[in-house]
C-alpha cells in the first residue's frame, strides 16, 4: 500500500519555488506572499479502494456518494483554499496535522487537514466482506492487551457509544507502551497529533451513518466491526508501525 501522503498530495507547478519542508517561522511566513498566476490544487480527493456500492448492505452507495463525494470533497476544497496563503505550503499532510495541532491549540488549517486524512484512513480501514477475526499477529496483540477479541469488540463499541457528539473511534498502537488501545476523539482530532499510531478508525459524525441507520449508532458500529473492518489492512499497518517503533523512528508512515 502506498504511503498516504503520496496518495493525496498533488504538487503545483512550479513546485521548486517553495521547499518541501519550510524550516523556520520566517520562511513559512514568507511563503504567504508567494502567488501563482494559475490556481492549483495542493491535495486531491482520492477514491475509496473499492466500488461505491461495495460496502452494501452495511453502508449504502447513497451514503458513500454523499459522505465521500460531498463532505470529504468539501474538506479538500477548504484545505486547498487555506493553503493558498498558508505557512504550511509544502508540508506533507501528516506534517501539517502535527504542526497545525499546535500543542492542543489548533491553527486554522488543522481541522480541514485532519478531516481529509481521517476520511482517507477511514475508507481504507474497510473492505467488502470484511470483519471476522484478525490475522494471527494482530489477534495475539489484541488478546494480550484486551484479554480476548470479544473484550476488544465490546470496548470498541462502548467507546464509540460513549462519545458525545461528533468525532471518531480508533484502535491505536501506543508508542511508549507498545500496546493496543481503543480511544475516541472529538470532532477532527487525530491520534497523529497526540503521538499515537492509528490502526483503525470509524467515523462517528452523523453524516457517516444517518441515511442508513438514523440514530442507531450501535448498529452502525457493530456492523463495522463484524462485517466491514479490513483486518488485512490493519495487519499491514501494524507491521509497518512495529518496524519503525523498533528502530525508534519518530515519523511513522501509517497508511
From Swiss-Prot:
GO molecular function: metal ion binding; superoxide dismutase activity
Cofactor: Fe cation
Catalytic activity: 2 superoxide + 2 H(+) = H2O2 + O2
SUPFAM superfamilies documented for this protein: Fe,Mn superoxide dismutase (SOD), C-terminal domain, Fe,Mn superoxide dismutase (SOD), N-terminal domain
Transit peptide residue numbers: 1-32
Enzyme Commission identifier(s): 1.15.1.1
Keyword terms: Chloroplast, Iron, Metal-binding, Oxidoreductase, Plastid, Transit peptide
Source superkingdom: Eukaryota
Residue positions binding Fe cation: 67, 119, 203, 207
Pfam families: Sod_Fe_C (PF02777), Sod_Fe_N (PF00081)
Induction: By light.
InterPro entries listed in its UniProt record: Mn/Fe_SOD, Mn/Fe_SOD_BS, Mn/Fe_SOD_C, Mn/Fe_SOD_N, Mn/Fe_SOD_N_sf, SOD_C_sf
GO cellular component: chloroplast nucleoid; thylakoid
Primary localization: plastid
Compartment(s) where it occurs, according to its Swiss-Prot or TrEMBL record: Plastid, Chloroplast
Cofactor binding: number and manner: Binds 1 Fe cation per subunit.
Tissue-by-tissue expression: Strongly expressed in the stems of the young seedlings, etiolated seedlings and embryogenic calli, but only minimally expressed in the leaves and the roots.
Subunit description: Homodimer.
Similarity comment: family membership: Belongs to the iron/manganese superoxide dismutase family.
Role of this protein: Destroys superoxide anion radicals which are normally produced within the cells and which are toxic to biological systems.
Name recorded for this polypeptide: Superoxide dismutase [Fe] 2, chloroplastic
Taxonomic source organism: Oryza sativa subsp. japonica (Rice)
